[in-house]
């Protein structure tokens, strides 16, 4: 990591990929296709969030159970006394979901571009993720709609914070070192 730090210090942020196994065939687990375009020198204009976000709605309960539903079908959330948090998946880390569940809330994980505003929920969490926030206009529009509810708690982390800022009217630009 010391050598990598030196390169990044000299040249700024770079896209890259970590491979865990030299025998890896380079295939994307979901599609089975070889993902040869990563890493690429292109950052601006490429929607990396779309590549890593879930493609369906996933409803997690604190007891460890979960159900899945197509993002294109109607989604019914059973009534319960637990608080419900919609998690906009921009590339969420599994530990974030575990941390929310440990706090006793239901988590409704939706794709980055899903219009969650028709759901009944108590809080909105916009996750971390890779890439350029300027490629996520659908998420920004949905977040902007949610922001009209002044009593709704909204939290964004990393990419989620940038999308929340854009929804509020901020301009986002990439710094040389991240």
Positions of predicted regions on the chain:
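Active-site-adjacent beta-strand anchor residues
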Residues: 86-90, 126, 157
């Amino acid at each position: 990591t010391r050598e990598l730090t030196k390169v990044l210090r000299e040249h700024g942020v770079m896209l890259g990929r970590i491979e865990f196994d030299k025998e890896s065939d380079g295939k994307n687990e979901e599609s089975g296709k070889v993902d040869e375009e990563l890493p690429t020198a292109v950052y601006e204009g490429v929607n990396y969030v779309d590549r890593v976000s879930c493609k369906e709605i996933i409803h997690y309960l604190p007891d460890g159970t979960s159900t899945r539903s197509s993002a294109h079908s109607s989604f019914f959330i059973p009534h319960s006394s637990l608080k419900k948090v919609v998690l906009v998946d921009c590339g969420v880390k599994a530990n974030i979901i575990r941390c929310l569940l440990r706090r006793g809330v239901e988590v409704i994980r939706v794709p980055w571009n899903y219009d969650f505003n028709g759901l009944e929920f108590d809080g909105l969490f916009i996750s971390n993720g890779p890439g350029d926030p300027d490629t996520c206009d659908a998420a920004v529009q949905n977040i902007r709609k949610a922001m009209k509810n002044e009593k709704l708690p909204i939290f964004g982390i990393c990419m989620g914070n940038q999308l929340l800022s854009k929804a509020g009217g901020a301009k986002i630009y990439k710094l040389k070192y991240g």
